[in-house]
């Protein structure tokens, strides 16, 4: 019948899309270059198509009562609204957006850093923070292509994890904060005992260590 042929065509399209996504992800993950979610971004539109297709079927599926049907639409609208609000709350630091399952922008750095979070985009904001708080000297371990001395001048002392524990003001990019943990001799694990004074753009952690 016509409906059966249509159904088979839809199933084939969705299976083909799913196979493409799996193939692309396998190639990306097993490749030598794996430095960010951007490598699998081309698959996102296809994933959205699959999700929308299943969502459409779920909404159109005959419900036992009209209340159940209305409940489905209400749930979808609520989740979409929640997603929009959640995205807007991180403004203007959209690169640092993580959903609530990952801990939001405050906790996402625990899972992924580098180009997923940190492009060195907050160096200018660090400059404003230093000026606003009248900080004369601050040690900076910055991940990015910007020039720390250009923005902070003599206030900045270039710093690295292998310098060991220190006191005073310290700014560390999230990427270095996390990746240093792979090296016991050059790790920022000692900072776990201190709370950051500020997370600038969620990509630069600023500490004021008294002792």
Spans of model-derived segments:
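Signature aromatic-anchored transmembrane alpha helix within multi-pass, membrane-resident enzymes
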Residues: 3, 17-22, 54-92
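Transmembrane alpha-helix segments characteristic
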Residues: 3, 7-29, 189-194
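Generic recognition of stable, solvent-exposed alpha-helical segments in well-folded globular domains
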Residues: 17, 21, 37-41, 46, ...
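Hydrophobic/aromatic-rich transmembrane helices and adjacent perimembrane loops
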Residues: 26-27, 34-56, 207
